[in-house]
């Protein structure tokens, strides 16, 4: 492409990424560390992070109408096995939507481990619901994860699952406490949150099939991707977050040694070409990891 065309593509990509994202409970400790803080996220990707304090979150939850909560509980019960009381998580979901409307935000991220003790519940239901409503919603308020998820969600228009690598043996086991129901092939269960025991984490039985794993480097300069296949889900392994999936990758050790740490963003399909183009438009380096070809 000519320089003028590259500039046009870059401007278009940044325009689609740009917007205000609320950090409910504040930005995480990791996100405050330079060079991967909110300021770098704004400069490189045009994503503005606005912190929302714990007192404000609590007040917003108190203002949620009980009738709205009851209506949402009935809606959840149509597709979710509610093995855990979820009134408080539903209040947090509805309060988050209201805060976004009031502050004209287009996305939200949650500082989970400052939030949980304050509101006595998790944002897992909120994250799951908001992603399926077309909102950029991300756990744990980390700048690299937020940036990678924004690229997948806003540039490619896809729902996503943010997860930790819990194990690596013949593949990798990804685990986290929520995923959008649109990625589900079977059941969705609300269970006690693994680390805290609070309500509620989700066990989402993810669809089997080809996926792309995505991560941004700590300096937000390099986009790393790996092709994989979800071979099993809803593993129900003890000692792990509730949504679990075994993912076959070409070279698990290369993936682990090459990735920046933290979370991976999973989306369905072979997205390597689209992500390469996105990286070029955003002036990011691009690297494929886990390079053995999967048949």
Predicted regions and their residues:
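Extended hydrophobic packing segments that form well-structured cores
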Residues: 201-295
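C-terminal catalytic subdomain
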Residues: 134-235
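Flexible, glycine/charged-enriched surface loops at secondary-structure junctions
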Residues: 49-52, 111, 158-164, 288-293
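A charged, amphipathic alpha-helical module
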Residues: 7-121
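A short, gly/pro- and small-residue-rich
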Residues: 120-137
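Internal, active-site/partner-interface "lid" segment
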Residues: 1-28, 160-183
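A short acidic, often aromatic-flanked loop/helix-cap motif at beta-alpha or helix-coil junctions
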Residues: 1-3, 55-61, 168-170, 294-295
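Predominant activation on well-ordered alpha-helical scaffold segments within soluble catalytic domains
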Residues: 39-42, 93-97, 145-153, 275-279
């Amino acid at each position: 492409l000519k320089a003028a065309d590259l500039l046009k593509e870059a401007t278009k990509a940044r325009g689609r990424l740009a917007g205000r994202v609320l950090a409910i409970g504040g930005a995480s400790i990791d996100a405050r560390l330079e060079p991967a803080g909110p300021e770098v996220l704004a400069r490189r990707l045009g994503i503005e992070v606005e912190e929302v304090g714990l007192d404000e979150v609590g007040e917003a939850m108190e203002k949620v109408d009980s009738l709205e909560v009851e209506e949402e509980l009935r809606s959840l019960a149509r597709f979710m096995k509610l093995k855990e009381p979820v009134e408080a998580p539903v209040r947090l979901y509805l309060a988050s939507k209201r805060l976004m409307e009031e502050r004209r935000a287009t996305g939200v991220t949650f500082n989970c481990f400052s939030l949980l003790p304050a509101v006595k519940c998790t944002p897992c239901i909120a994250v799951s619901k908001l992603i399926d409503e077309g909102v950029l919603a991300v756990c744990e308020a980390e700048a690299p994860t937020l940036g990678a998820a924004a690229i997948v969600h806003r540039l490619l228009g896809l729902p996503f699952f943010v997860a930790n690598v819990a194990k690596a043996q013949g593949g990798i086991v990804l685990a986290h406490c929520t995923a959008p129901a649109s990625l589900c092939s079977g059941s969705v269960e609300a269970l006690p949150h693994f680390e805290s025991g609070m309500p509620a984490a989700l066990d989402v039985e993810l669809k089997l099939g080809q996926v792309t794993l995505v991560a941004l480097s700590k300096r937000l300069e390099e986009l790393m991707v790996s092709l994989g296949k979800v071979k099993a889900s809803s593993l129900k392994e003890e000692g792990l977050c509730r949504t679990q999936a075994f993912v076959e990758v070409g070279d698990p050790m290369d993936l682990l040694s090459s990735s920046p740490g933290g979370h991976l963003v999973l989306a369905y399909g072979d997205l390597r070409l689209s992500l390469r183009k996105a990286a070029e438009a955003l002036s990011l380096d691009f690297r494929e990891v886990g390079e053995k070809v999967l048949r």
